[in-house]
């Protein structure tokens, strides 16, 4: 197949167009760079993500060839860029440890020790390489299992941003949602994962908008429903990055005590998508 017929999309060829698109979304000048720069330096939000940002630049793969059609690969690249622009636009990099959440009662002040970080402390693998890195460093020091806390926070905050994108960026919402549905189909089967990872996977799927077929370990059904309530709170338009932090504290407290053992497929149940968040759950998790 010749290059003219290839379904692959190359970042270099459309970088300037994407930069202008990003500027139109955020009204900010954002540099677009090759993701390989982060991979080579072993930094970024997650080592297996296909795109990331440090709050100033957005890092995208040099070539996208996930799908058979060029248009699908272009849409995928555009959706990745939109999500990272959303992280910049909607405050992922503006986290403040002491700032109150909008949807949750604040647990951070009750758990925090006096900060002992320094300006040279780069916290989590260089994803936030500016002043606010120390704020997240202070937050993640609350957790004995920082890897689990980071996984939870990444899922919750990405879910918040995606919900906000769907609400604010109406022009791309249809394409964005279609790509999310395709992404769900590529996710691992929940029944093949150990218990704790299955619950994390349920969070990913809920944040991607999946309503049917979300399976969770039956013996942890109550925890799964509580997590779903928090995921829904985070998806509300006025939720902030501080809400993502508060949700992380609550979800971590539930998942940390679950043994990450494999279960039989018969030990899973489907979450009832028709369940609504009650006033009681709102009082339990957040503000009335």
Regions found by a protein language model. Give the residues of each.
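Segments forming glycine/polar-rich beta-alpha architectures that bind adenosine-containing cofactors
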Residues: 282-288
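Extended non-catalytic scaffold regions that mediate assembly and binding
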Residues: 268-275
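Acidic, Ser/Thr/Pro-rich beta/coil linker or hinge segments at domain junctions
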Residues: 259-263
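Basic/hydrophobic alpha-helical interface regions
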Residues: 1-248, 253, 257
């Amino acid at each position: 197949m010749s290059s003219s017929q290839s379904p692959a999309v190359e970042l270099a060829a459309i970088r300037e167009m994407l930069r202008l698109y990003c500027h139109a979304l955020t009204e900010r000048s954002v540099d677009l760079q090759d993701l390989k720069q982060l991979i080579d330096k072993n930094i970024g939000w997650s080592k297996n993500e296909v795109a990331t940002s440090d709050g100033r630049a957005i890092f995208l793969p040099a070539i996208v060839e996930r799908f058979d059609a060029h248009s699908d690969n272009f849409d995928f690249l555009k959706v990745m860029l939109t999500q990272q622009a959303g992280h910049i636009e909607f405050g992922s990099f503006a986290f403040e440890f002491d700032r109150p959440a909008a949807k949750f009662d604040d647990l951070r002040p009750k758990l925090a020790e006096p900060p002992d970080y320094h300006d040279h402390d780069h916290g989590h693998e260089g994803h936030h390489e500016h002043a606010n890195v120390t704020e997240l460093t202070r937050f993640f020091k609350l957790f004995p299992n920082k890897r689990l806390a980071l996984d939870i926070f990444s899922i919750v905050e990405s879910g918040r941003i995606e919900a906000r994108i769907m609400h604010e960026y109406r022009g791309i919402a249809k394409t964005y949602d279609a790509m999310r549905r395709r992404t769900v189909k590529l996710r691992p089967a929940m029944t093949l994962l150990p218990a704790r990872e299955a619950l994390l996977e349920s969070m990913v799927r809920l944040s991607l908008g999946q309503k049917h077929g979300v399976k969770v370990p039956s013996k942890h059904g109550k925890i799964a429903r509580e997590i779903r309530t928090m995921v829904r709170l985070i998806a509300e338009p006025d939720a902030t990055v501080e809400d993502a932090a508060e949700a992380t504290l609550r979800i971590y407290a539930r998942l940390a005590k679950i043994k990450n053992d494999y279960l039989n497929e018969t030990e899973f149940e489907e979450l009832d998508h028709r369940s609504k968040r009650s006033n009681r759950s709102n009082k339990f998790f957040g503000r009335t």
